């Protein structure tokens, strides 16, 4: 599995935030793989807030908590050249009950995942 990120801001973040985002991506990939082992494709995953919390166009929100940090990751899952790809379009560190990230994520509704992939940055590989 390869992790790509669409936003350049990732590289300006503190190392602990970068590590948390990568850890969240690996956790998400493990959950998706668990479904695939049960012959349930990503497009058929419904009613599981731990994988697809909210939908924004062709992207989904993944909620992840590490220590006191609450992450919201806007992602899509692709298979390119027989490789699993998690494409992170955006992310937010959520503070208290602030839901401003929803409007930020909604702004990406019209983004085509393949076009975003072509302009994304490779950040990690995980199995």
Positions of PLM-derived features:
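Generic cytosolic/nucleocytoplasmic N-terminal low-complexity/intrinsically disordered segments
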Residues: 1, 54, 93-94
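Arg/Lys-rich, positively charged N-terminal/basic patches that mediate binding to nucleic acids
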Residues: 1-34, 115-127
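Intrinsically disordered, low-complexity regions
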Residues: 8, 25, 29, 37-43, ...
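Intrinsic disorder/low-complexity signal
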Residues: 12, 47-48, 53, 83, ...
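Alpha-helix capping and helix-coil boundary motifs
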Residues: 14, 36-43, 90-91, 112
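Enriched for short, Lys/Arg-rich terminal
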Residues: 62-127
């Amino acid at each position: 599995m390869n992790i790509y990120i669409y936003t350049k801001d990732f590289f300006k973040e503190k190392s602990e935030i970068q590590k948390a985002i990568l850890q969240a991506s690996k956790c998400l990939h493990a959950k998706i793989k668990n479904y695939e082992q049960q012959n349930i494709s990503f497009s058929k995953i419904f009613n599981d807030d731990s994988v697809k919390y909210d939908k924004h166009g062709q992207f989904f929100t993944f909620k992840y908590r590490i220590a006191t940090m609450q992450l919201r990751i806007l992602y899509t899952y692709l298979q390119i050249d027989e490789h699993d790809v998690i494409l992170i379009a955006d992310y937010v560190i959520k503070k208290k009950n602030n839901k401003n990230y929803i409007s930020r994520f909604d702004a990406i509704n019209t983004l085509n995942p393949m076009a975003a992939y072509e302009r994304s940055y490779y950040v990690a590989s995980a199995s």
